[in-house]
């Protein structure tokens, strides 16, 4: 049986891909012409159908300036002289270390709250790591209950520190703690929150591009938060294509596996489908063990080997050669993941997310309106962006198998060990 890898800085802090209309930033694939904190006045147009997950945008023009990083204090505390200063935070313990950053659990000396400090080492010859610039520039404009909050940015000669809200665990570790599949009611609330956050960023012209359980943080009250925006990209970028090395293999859609670099928000929706199945079934949907070929075979075994009739244009993808793949017919998803049949409308929703042809995948907003969520309180669809779903009466997580009702609450924290995490 395949085992999840929940280790790494990714499971502490994670990035996104959204820019509000009034805070668009110039984004380019190389460092040579990127100013993350410069606004652009170019209009970005959204063209999509109500249910189609693939949203395309006009590109904004990009200038030729050198990259700059400027210190920005938390918008929520603009009058406090202590925000934006390194000595405003106390490091408590190291949570993880990667090739260019170290993450610490910390405490704010301003308000006493726990924070996560992502300390990025700056090297004169290389400049600021581009993924860090991208993450900071995107996150500073995002304000949503289901997106990890960037409190502060501290820039010194030696380091760039991103100060995030501290979140106790992630979905990968949560599922490892509760093997065999999660409580169906909890799956529904986690998925609703994931779609809520994705709908927000997609409407803001942003793709996450790296959805996986390690990048979905879960607070001690059960709030799910999108994180790890290092691979996120605003769809106002001038380039029409992106690197296909963007999503962990198990959650990577078949179009990207086949070499497509022309994708949009539909990329994220495949990952949603994989995570949905994994939460219900208790195992990864497509746990490839070898390489891209093996990963595709696992997908086609269940969904059917594509052809021009089921996937227009598939024969023109760089890595598609019909003779390389076993010819499979599509199966009912419950044949592969039997627990989908135990939950009303779960199989139908999963089938509309896990579509090989990208344009057939359900959008985040359309998924929120699926019958799978029909038994949730209507007030959930009326919440403001910054309101938690748990502010609605009678909305709460249920105990997992073997747990008591006191698992979630302010006096409890997850027994998570991140100190051994490695990038």
From Swiss-Prot:
InterPro entries for this protein: CDK (IPR050108), Kinase-like_dom_sf (IPR011009), Prot_kinase_dom (IPR000719), Protein_kinase_ATP_BS (IPR017441), Ser/Thr_kinase_AS (IPR008271)
GO annotations of cellular component type: cytoplasmic cyclin-dependent protein kinase holoenzyme complex; plasma membrane
Keywords per UniProt: ATP-binding, Cell cycle, Cell division, Cell membrane, Kinase, Membrane, Nucleotide-binding, Serine/threonine-protein kinase, Transferase, Wnt signaling pathway
Residue ranges of domain Protein kinase in the record: 89-373
Residues in coiled coil: none
Oligomeric form and interacting partners: Interacts with ccny; ccny mediates its recruitment to the plasma membrane and promotes phosphorylation of lrp6.
The protein, known as: Cyclin-dependent kinase 14
Native organism: Xenopus tropicalis
Lineage: Eukaryota, Metazoa, Chordata, Craniata, Vertebrata
Gene field: cdk14
